Amino acid sequence: MVVNLCLPQFRPRIHCNKVSADGYEVENLISEDLIKRSHGFRTEYFIRPPIYVTVSFPFNVEICRVNIDLTTGGYQNVSGLELYTSALSSRVSQDAQDCWTTGPVETSVPDKEAFTLVGKVLLKNQNHVVFSHRGFKARPPFSPMEVTLLSPAVVAQELWNKGALSLSHVAHLKIGITHVTGSGISCIKRLEVWGQPARTCSQEVINSVLLIASESLPQDLDLHAPALPMESDCDPGGQSESQHSPCTLQDMSEVESDVPEEFLDPITLEIMPCPMLLPSGKVIDQSTLEKCNLSEAAWGRVPSDPFTGLAFTPQSQPLPHPSLKARIDRFLLQHSISGCRLLGRAQTPSAMTPSVITLPSRKRKTEQAEHSSHYSLGMSASSSATSPLFSPTTSEPTAKKMKATSELGLTDMDCSAGPVSHEQKLAQSLEIALTSTLGSMPSFTARLTKGQLQLGTRGSSACRRPASSSEHPRSVSGPECASCKQAFSSYSTNEPVYQLPCGHLLCRPCLSEKQRSQPMMCTACRQPVTSQDVLRVHF
């Protein structure tokens, strides 16, 4: 019996010397997440060979065979592979074995000179490679392995024995991608390293490996039964993980093996929900084409064919592929597995009960509107009863914000008083939009300020002297000084303006003259004024 040492239960470490693409990190090859493991590893499009992926084991192993799947959506990119091995010293390996039984261990990758070349292959239109060790023999308690029959599409290559430690005492395995076809992208779909613990491992490590291997494999399968061509398509976790996982790796591999290559996007390797036929004859998904166009636009280039680089013209444009779209939809309807995340598949849980999601938000909006309405009504009532129009040291933006808040409160009050028709709501929204737009114009602001000041002056005079206001009616054409009749405006005045307790305004020179004469009184209404009651106002 041999075990797949790349399973996450054995805590391997993996490293790549080049940058990987987003979502296709090298850690996907040994990840516990089945979705990530199905994505595999892929470098960025601008990375060129050589590329080295190093797998480090927490204990020394004896390699039986190495299976590498280089499938990239039907295109053969990788054409040259090399395999290297490295062995640690006995002291370091013994420490790693002791740490592996208690917790994870961080192994260090040796230098380039420490690796030994044990295998090399050149591919011609093949995507599966199997490196096998001819002299491998299973030791007790591991049972002898059966002969594995390889498929004709799989390239078989024997490993070279470069010494006693090159294949039987391996701590690090390095896979090198040396050549790719054309401008292809270097990638590894799946990686499996089958073997057993080395002879130098302690009995405790051997028992732990045997126990984990027995728990990982299904009980109805023999432990030494091989599979072809990739042997770890079963769920590597125990029964508890299989109960929580809605889609096993075996089901996923069956689906992926049944998916025709023409249904997969050659760039993202996903099923295309909306295939587009390019002028070059290639077919990609519409979302992939949009991402390519955005990437080109970021560099100031016009949309072009991702495969040829030729810009689109009115005569050569990407077109929908309705016949392929119909075939893809039929395939997705016939091959549906619960829990598998296929591109374009509708997610039913999020669309089950839309009312449950929308109703609470509507309720919160209604409560917030009522709260703001009551708050604005209370603020407007208290401000009209206790404070004048201008507050001390109140700037112009603050006054505009308070005015907008009061208008919003009055609008909410009108809406809550009774049923409002659509025409009334439209008129109110247009009026608010017009007011907010014209609020920055000087002529509109000056006219609005004059009307507000007139209303405020009359209201304050009526509150303080109702009898005198009725006896001496007065029409104010605009904010002006009560003594020298100088007009005030937020865009014309440069001098400070002061307000008397009676509500009338004075400029700075007139206020200085009033302070020299005792007793101090208002010129307009002849009310006595004290210096501490005079407030400075801002338009």
Curated annotation (Swiss-Prot):
Record's catalysed reaction(s): S-ubiquitinyl-[E2 ubiquitin-conjugating enzyme]-L-cysteine + [acceptor protein]-L-lysine = [E2 ubiquitin-conjugating enzyme]-L-cysteine + N(6)-ubiquitinyl-[acceptor protein]-L-lysine
Asked whether the UniProt record includes Nucleus among its keywords, one would answer yes
Query: Origin, by domain of life?
Result: Eukaryota
User: Where does the UniProt annotation locate this protein?
Assistant: Nucleus
The organs and tissues expressing this protein are described as: Expressed in testis and placenta.
Q: In which pathway does it act?
A: Protein modification; protein ubiquitination
Q: Where is the composition biased (Low complexity)?
A: 374-395
> Which Gene Ontology terms describe the biological processes this protein takes part in?
protein polyubiquitination
* Sequence ranges of Polar residues compositional bias: 239-249
Residue ranges of domain U-box in the record: 258-338
* InterPro entries, alphabetized: RNF37_RING-Ubox, Ubox5, Ubox5_N, Ubox_domain, Znf_RING, Znf_RING/FYVE/PHD, Znf_RING_CS
| EC number(s) recorded for this UniProt protein | 2.3.2.27
Q: Does the keyword Transmembrane apply?
A: no
Which keywords accompany this UniProt record? Answer: Metal-binding, Nucleus, Transferase, Ubl conjugation pathway, Zinc, Zinc-finger
Q: Using the UniProt record, give the first listed, main subcellular location.
A: nucleus
Kindly list the GO CC terms recorded for this protein.
focal adhesion; nuclear body; nucleus
Pfam families on file: DUF5918, U-box, zf-RING_5
Q: What is known of its domains?
A: The U-box domain mediates interaction with E2 ubiquitin ligases and is required for the ubiquitin-protein ligase activity.
Described function: May have a ubiquitin-protein ligase activity acting as an E3 ubiquitin-protein ligase or as a ubiquitin-ubiquitin ligase promoting elongation of ubiquitin chains on substrates.
Q: How does it assemble?
A: Interacts with UBE2L3. Interacts with VCP.
> What name does the UniProt record give this protein?
RING finger protein 37
Corresponding gene?
Answer: Ubox5
